[in-house]
Amino acid sequence: MLISTRSRYGLKVMYELAQKYGAQPVFLKDIANAHNISEKYLSKLVIPLRGAGLISSFRGAHGGYALAREPRNITMREIVQVLEGEIAPATGARGRRHGEPADSHPTESVWSLLDKTVYETLENVTLESLIQAGRNNAINYQI
């Protein structure tokens, strides 16, 4: 499964909002500048994320975007699914929903296993776990 630029950038937006969860809303231009991504492009990504109830937008001088739920309650699967559509990494799995049985050809069991593995992996990674992983991998320059 190739994760598109759309999902990669959408995940970056969600990660930035998760890092600022509970603080003031974040301006999209700040995220765009931090990652050298077009603000116009990011503005197209936040529309489906907001529509899915993953983020909220606020107007005014203190406006911007914020997560609509706690980072621990938002999974990578939700984000990718909103931005990409149904997750089916293998051609043989396309057209089926997660958990539906594959047809009888022996190769279909491989595609079904791949589908299940990708789905479960994305489902088990939350924004909170990504933030924690980022903290654990941060370089400590203290002497």
Enumerate the language-model features and the residues they cover.
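Conserved segment of winged-helix/HTH DNA-binding domains
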Residues: 71-96, 116
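Alpha-helical residues within the helix-turn-helix
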Residues: 33, 50-51
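N-terminal helix-turn-helix DNA-binding core of bacterial DNA-binding proteins
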Residues: 3-5, 11, 15-38
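Residues within the DNA-recognition helix of helix-turn-helix
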Residues: 45
